[in-house]
Amino acid sequence: MRCGDATQPEEWWDGQPFGAIMLDAPCTGSGILRTRPEVKVRQSENNLVLLQGQQLALLRATWPLLAEGGELLYTTCSVLAGENQRVLAEFVAGESSASPAALAPPTQGDDGLACAASPEGLTFFPSAAHQGGFVALLRKTAAVPTVTPRRPRRRRSVKSSEAL
């Protein structure tokens, strides 16, 4: 497991491709409004456009880190197609090695879990028992040029006269 700014992998990535990446992208939080109504106050159309740009940037920055045959799980706590299906459709259209993998919707139980499947992923709708959100799985079908990994910093030897 690695922790770092996903938009700047050259700062922390060691060059070893990942077999799996989970990308929990920043979003409007439209799927959690029932429990966090203050989220609605912070949103605007401009904010949605900004978030879509961040989501695409994160997908584009992390995709080269994924090994051929690897999978990227994309999640948001939003139910808006503009942050989910449209972002993924735009990414897949521009990335020939990205292939959406079908996800089977969970069976609906007595708890009122409502889910809609699309070619891009699954949208879960908020209910009395659940928060809403989106999940999609992308499979990498071919190797693509990767980010140049960081180079280990050389330690400069310090002369005893410089140490004082």
List each model region and its residues.
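C-terminal catalytic and target-recognition region of SAM-dependent MTase-like enzymes
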Residues: A6-M22, P26-T28, R34, V49, ...
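Glycine-rich S-adenosyl-L-methionine
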Residues: V39-A67
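Tryptophan-centered motif/residue detector
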Residues: E11-W13, L33, V41-R42, W63
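Canonical radical SAM enzyme core domain
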Residues: G4-T7, Q43
